[in-house]
Amino acid sequence: MRDLRALPAAGRRGQPVRILAGDYNATLDHAHFRRVLSRGYADAADRAGMGLTPTWSSPGGRIRLTIDHVLVDRRCAVHRVRVHDLPGSDHRAVFADVRLP
């Protein structure tokens, strides 16, 4: 997460549009993650009304968390987010349909 603090702010006119995706090991309420969101990024699943869809489960499935994210520049429109099981992985893949500005 420290590396993410070095990201330039998003959503500014004239700046490139950025989409960041991956295993952040952070829920939407994680402090460092919130700082990234405050720099002009939005969680695609949250924008699509699916912000609490679990992407990771503990062995046995007792704990289910949303820790894999697609972050979009706030200028982007998110049309749909889907989460799919990945055979052999304890994480689920996150797919987002995004419209660039």
What are the residue ranges of the model-derived segments?
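His/acidic metal-ligating clusters that form di-metal
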Residues: 1-21
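Residue-level marker of positions within ordered structural domains that often coincide
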Residues: 9, 76, 101
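Active site of divalent-metal-dependent phosphoester/diester hydrolases
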Residues: 13-19, 25-82, 86-87
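Short, well-ordered beta-strand micro-motif
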Residues: 70-72, 95-99
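A short C-terminal boundary segment appended to hydrolase-like catalytic domains
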Residues: 87, 99-101
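Short, conserved phosphate/pyrophosphate- and ester-handling motifs at nucleotide-, phospho-/glycolipid
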Residues: 91
